[in-house]
Curated annotation (Swiss-Prot):
Species of provenance: Bacillus subtilis (strain 168)
GO cellular component, one term: cytoplasm
Enzyme type, top EC level: hydrolase
InterPro entries: HAD-like_sf, HAD-SF_hydro_IA, HAD-SF_hydro_IIIA, HAD_sf, PGPP1/Gep4
GO molecular function: phosphatase activity; phosphatidylglycerophosphatase activity
Name used for this protein in its record: Probable phosphatase YqeG
Length: 172
C-alpha cells in the first residue's frame, strides 16, 4: 500500500531538473504543480528570475502549466497572476477534484500531464490516487507552515519505510 500511494514515479532535487526535453520524451503536454516549497519558499511572495525563465521555457515548448495549491486565494493569486499562470487555490489535495479540473482547464488528458510537488501526503498521494505521473521535489525551504510541519513528520516515516523495503535509492 505504501508503494502504491506514496512512491513518486520520479524524484528530483528541484523544479529546474525538470526540463521540457525530458517531459517531451514522455509526451507530457501539461504540468500540475504545487506552489509553496515546490516552486518557491512558502513565505516568498513572488517568483525568482530563474523560475520565470523556467515557466517561459515550458511555454516555448508548448507545455502548459497550472498551479494547484491548498493555500488561500490571496496567496496563490498574488503569485500566479503576474506570471499569467492559471491557478487553483484551496485545492483540498490529496483529493482529485482540483487535479482533474486543472487538466480540463488545460484542455488535455490525464495521461498528458504530470503532478509535481514537495509533499507525499498531498501532491504524490493525490497524483498517484488519481492516476497521474508524479514527480517529488526536495522542498525549497527547510522551514514550513504549521500543518506542513506535521505532514513532514509523517512523510519521514513513510520515506524511511519505502527506503527499508528497497523502493527508493535517493538520499533524503
Amino acid at each position: 500500500m505504501l508503494k502504491k500511494f506514496f512512491l513518486p514515479d520520479e524524484f528530483v532535487k528541484n523544479i529546474f531538473h525538470i526540463t521540457p526535453e525530458k517531459l517531451k520524451e514522455r509526451n507530457v503536454k501539461g504540468i500540475i504543480t504545487d506552489l509553496d516549497n515546490t516552486l518557491v519558499e512558502w513565505d516568498r511572495p513572488n517568483a525568482t528570475p530563474r523560475l520565470i525563465e523556467w515557466f517561459e521555457e515550458m511555454k516555448e515548448h508548448g507545455i502548459k502549466v497550472t498551479i494547484v495549491s491548498n493555500n488561500n486565494e490571496r496567496r496563490v493569486k498574488l503569485f500566479s497572476e503576474p506570471l499569467g499562470i492559471p491557478f487553483i487555490y484551496k485545492a483540498r489535495k490529496p483529493m482529485g477534484k482540483a487535479f482533474n479540473r486543472a487538466v480540463r482547464n488545460m484542455e488535455l488528458k490525464k495521461e498528458d500531464c504530470v503532478v509535481i510537488g514537495d509533499q507525499l501526503l498531498t501532491d504524490v498521494l493525490g497524483g498517484n490516487r488519481n492516476g497521474y505521473h508524479t514527480i517529488l521535489v526536495v522542498p525549497v525551504a527547510s522551514s514550513d507552515g504549521f500543518i506542513t510541519r506535521f505532514n513532514r513528520q509523517v512523510e519521514r516515516r513513510i520515506l524511511s519505510a519505502l527506503k527499508r523495503k528497497g523502493h527508493i535509492q535517493w538520499e533524503e
